[in-house]
Amino acid sequence: MKGNTMIAQVVEPYAGALMTLAQETNKVEAFAENCRALLSLFQESAEFRSFVMNPLVKAEDKKGVLQGVCGQDVDTYFLNFLFLLVDRRRIVFLEGICQEFVALQRKLNNIVLADVTSAQPLTTDQEAAIADQVKQMTGANAVELNISTDADLIGGVVIKVGSKVFDASLRGQLRRISMDLLGSN
């Protein structure tokens, strides 16, 4: 718990500073896309994660890899922010900073993140219907769906928005029926 507080003390100010820079330069969406791309890279490449986290790797090598990963189209301000993290030895917090920045961008644009778990893969129409339903329930401008599958649900979906969970799965219905039957005895 103490470690999370210490990480938050580093992550939040840097993410806030990046958001301020993004707003001042009217590049919030571009920076958010850059952060999402980096988060995706952290998920897909253990090699990249290890490289960035390794304190023995020289700063110039890290800058070169970051520049190569971001490509020619990345905004100069964003790239300079990454270089600042390298110079201040805060690059190990990059993943957390990107996660916090994306959360700030969602809040700024009134976008809700919904974790959707279904028994089977959802069709595009089903995803759109869930997004519309979540939008109605939350009053958000838009909804981002984080979709996963879990065959143990048997059927239906479980939707988590913030701390609220909406269980419309067959497994959840069976559990509620079981609790009702056990409770009536």
Curated annotation (Swiss-Prot):
Quote the InterPro entries the UniProt record gives: ATP_synth_OSCP/delta_N_sf, ATPase_OSCP/d_CS, ATPase_OSCP/dsu
Q: Which UniProt keywords apply?
A: ATP synthesis, CF(1), Hydrogen ion transport, Ion transport, Membrane, Thylakoid, Transport
Give a short account of what the protein does: F(1)F(0) ATP synthase produces ATP from ADP in the presence of a proton or sodium gradient. F-type ATPases consist of two structural domains, F(1) containing the extramembraneous catalytic core and F(0) containing the membrane proton channel, linked together by a central stalk and a peripheral stalk. During catalysis, ATP synthesis in the catalytic domain of F(1) is coupled via a rotary mechanism of the central stalk subunits to proton translocation. This protein is part of the stalk that links CF(0) to CF(1). It either transmits conformational changes from CF(0) to CF(1) or is implicated in proton conduction.
Q: Which Pfam families match?
A: OSCP
- Assembly description: F-type ATPases have 2 components, F(1) - the catalytic core - and F(0) - the membrane proton channel. F(1) has five subunits: alpha(3), beta(3), gamma(1), delta(1), epsilon(1). CF(0) has four main subunits: a(1), b(1), b'(1) and c(10-14). The alpha and beta chains form an alternating ring which encloses part of the gamma chain. F(1) is attached to F(0) by a central stalk formed by the gamma and epsilon chains, while a peripheral stalk is formed by the delta, b and b' chains.
Q: How does it sit in the membrane?
A: Peripheral membrane protein
Protein family according to the UniProt entry: Belongs to the ATPase delta chain family.
SUPFAM superfamilies with a match to the protein in the record: N-terminal domain of the delta subunit of the F1F0-ATP synthase
| Natural source organism | Picosynechococcus sp. (strain ATCC 27264 / PCC 7002 / PR-6) (Agmenellum quadruplicatum)
What gene does this protein come from?
atpH
Membrane-crossing segments per the record: none
An example Gene Ontology molecular-function term: proton-transporting ATP synthase activity, rotational mechanism
Name-wise, this protein is: ATP synthase subunit delta
Question: What top-level branch of life does the organism fall under?
Answer: Bacteria
Task: Indicate where this protein resides in the cell.
Answer: Cellular thylakoid membrane
Lineage runs:
Bacteria, Bacillati, Cyanobacteriota, Cyanophyceae, Oscillatoriophycideae
GO cellular component terms listed in the entry, alphabetical order? plasma membrane-derived thylakoid membrane; proton-transporting ATP synthase complex
Kindly report the protein's main subcellular placement as a broad class: membrane
